Amino acid sequence: MHTKTVAKPATSKVNGVDTGIADLFYLSDGKHFGSMREVLDFYHKEVEKSFGEFSSLRNKKRKIRHFLRKHKNLPDDVRRSLIKKMDKLNRMIQKANAPYRKKRHYYQMLDKEIKDAVLSYVSSLDKETITVLELLDIREFNKSRRVNGMFSCFARGKAQQKLMQTLNWKGFDFVEVVPDYTSQVCPECSNLDKANRNGKSFLCTCCGYKGDADHTAGINIKARYLDKNLSKICEDNKYNHKVLQSKLSGYYSRKNELYKQQHPEKFVKKQNSEEQAASAT
């Protein structure tokens, strides 16, 4: 872990950074760096497919071996034929090094994309810029890599680790904030709703705010650092996750109610639009 605890000087520029897949680093100011789409497409289309074929060969060989052990009294010609098939499968397995070659290429692609995105982002920074990131559980990413071969979480964790290491090495300040609800809450009216996000799109079910989902998360990550009330809630409840989520949910609910009171015209307009849409159907 490379977290720095930094003060909040008013003169500093603050970047909220969402670490994702479609866009590797999406900033609160709308800029974005890198993408994992091509890398993950290669993994799913080439690496997974290749290992699937490799596994199929091994399963066929295993079935023949099991059949031979179970049936001791097979005719000689049948037994010889099955042994020949098993030998052929064994030779195919020994020659099938493509899965591991493709897997190595995947890691090379992954490392290059992360390196390029990190260097591009860090090169764009002023010295007084503070980078705000989500606090990610790197252990879970490593577990994901070992257990189920799904590399999207692993890639995201690796990218953020590399970014923190580089920021630390280059002398830039950064801080991590708890990630709860940063992808679900509306940065405009504070409406907290899972339905706000649909893939890469964000559309608030309350005020109608819409935008890129990763950009929206970057905005919320920045707010999680700058908003003193949010910071206090997170700090006071960092060892009790259930209470933390309850406090955050309550805080956003109160802010949303206040927003509705201060901007009633937005909700009247939204209600009229919904009624017109309903009558049209």
What are the residue ranges of the model-derived segments?
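Positively charged, helix-rich recognition surfaces that bind polyanionic ligands
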Residues: 1-281
